[in-house]
Amino acid sequence: MTKIITSPSFITQLREQIEYPNAGVFSKVLLKDNACQYTLFCLAANTDISEHTSIRNATINVIEGRGLLTLSGEDIVLENGIFVFMPANAPHALKAEENLTFLLTLSEKVTDKN
């Protein structure tokens, strides 16, 4: 389900969008435009996402579950209500300790024009 923005608003109940796979990752792009993309990630317990980077800034907003994010070498416990900002090109990895759902927002990296 991807919704391209055609009106000024979009509303959904995130908990109704959650779908856990038996193993691994299920992701669903909820909304995107030229500057941002909003993707719901549902990870089955014991799922690992190996270290990688992104050319875009990102935020993680945890909806439910528990996991561990390693961001630029720092371990961050992910649990309901946690919000994390990840700058573009920051190395990060993730392990879902139990079923874990979060909203990932990708946004354009702002270039310093000075």
Give the residues covered by each predicted segment:
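A short, N-terminal "cap"/entry segment at the start of jelly-roll beta-barrel domains
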Residues: 1-35, 70
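Conserved short histidine dyad/triad with adjacent acidic residue
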Residues: 24, 37-54
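A cytosolic small-molecule/anion-sensing beta-strand core signal
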Residues: 63-64, 79-80, 98
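Short acidic-glycine-tyrosine-enriched beta hairpin
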Residues: 73-88
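Ligand-binding loop in jelly-roll beta-barrel domains
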Residues: 88-111
